[in-house]
Regions:
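Eukaryotic helix-grip
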Residues: 1-328
Length: 328
């Protein structure tokens, strides 16, 4: 499985360098915050969806995409594939190859809706393999110019790090296609997954994280992708825009769990100033509690973007920290 995952990573990183053309199709529903590109071969139609997030640590996003339990897989995929997700499960989870490796390897089953309601649902059995790599001058026969980054090594410049989470379908004897009466069609993921790269604003500063989500559709020989198949691929690819929401949601959920495990003293309810900007509260400047740290802040210092009230301090990318599966 590890060799298959590493080979799939090589294929996906190769797709990053493919000359893709911008997808322009007025018949498709597209999101203004997602840049779409397409590439077609005789057997595969691929869409790359690109979004830019604030400068989070790529290891936090890799931890989010690990999902090594069925509960976390269903919870995260329900947010990512909003309106498309049907069901899913983690069939097997393998621990990282070393105590300090960010390697993630799970075997998953996923069912999603098709392009139209009357069409059978789609389901996939696939290997989800993720890791974080450092760009370097050395070459390896398997991954030229890429080497795994471990927490035991000194931190490298942000621009020299890339994280990958790839989905590659596998044939598992014990997980054959579902019965016909369930109206579900078994298909395959090929050249599918996330590539996370830092976007440098200048030589020494990071501007954000560029996330590319590749989604592909197998095409029968001597045919082009159907309009329904193309619509489905585009809809799935655009789900990358929900990654920010999923990250914040997981961050808040883990923060609340830590508060239950280690309760902190209650904050004074009569604080006279905003915890973030230090402006004095008044009739016009009301108190609002942060749902994570419980500090009292004014409305201007409160972020309700993801239906969760977070103060300006908690919503900073540098404050974002998730449980690391490789550190357990």
């Amino acid at each position: 499985m590890r060799d298959m995952g590493e080979a799939a990573v090589e294929t996906l990183l190769g797709a990053v360098r493919l000359p893709m053309k911008k997808l322009v199709d007025t018949s498709l529903q597209t999101r203004p915050d997602v840049a779409l590109y397409e590439h077609a071969t005789s057997s595969l139609y691929t869409v790359k969806a690109v979004v830019v997030l604030p400068p989070y640590d790529v290891l936090e996003l890799l931890a989010l995409l690990d999902m090594r339990s069925t509960e976390s897989f269903r919870h995260t995929m329900r947010i990512l594939l909003d309106g498309v997700f049907v069901d899913g499960a983690v069939l097997h989870a393998t621990p990282p190859s070393s105590p300090h490796s960010a390697e993630s390897m799970t075997l998953n089953w996923l069912a999603v809706q098709n392009a139209k309601v009357h069409l059978p649902n789609r389901d996939y059995v696939f290997l989800k393999y993720g890791n974080c790599y450092a760009l370097c001058g050395q070459c390896s026969p398997r991954r030229p110019a890429f080497m795994p980054t471990t927490s035991s090594t000194p931190s490298r410049p942000l621009k020299d790090t890339v994280a990958v989470s790839v989905w590659e379908s596998v044939d598992v004897t014990e997980c054959g296609p579902l019965p016909n009466d369930l109206n579900t069609l078994r298909l395959h993921f090929r050249q599918t997954g996330y590539v996370l790269e830092y976007m440098p604003r200048s030589r020494d500063a990071s501007h954000g994280i560029c996330i590319s989500f590749f989604m592909s559709e197998e095409v029968p020989s001597s045919r082009s992708v159907s309009s329904l198949g193309k619509a489905w691929v585009v809809r799935m690819a655009q789900s990358v825009a929900n990654l920010h929401h999923a990250l914040v949601h997981q961050y808040v959920a883990e923060g609340r769990q830590r508060q239950l495990d280690m309760p902190r003293p209650m904050k004074p309810t009569a604080a006279s100033r905003c915890h973030c900007c230090s402006k004095r509260f008044s009739i016009l400047r009301r108190r609002h509690p942060c749902h994570l740290c419980s500090e009292l802040v004014c409305k201007r210092c409160l972020d309700k973007q993801f239906q969760v009230d977070l103060c300006a301090t908690c919503r900073l990318p540098s404050s974002m920290s998730l449980f690391k599966y490789w550190a357990s």
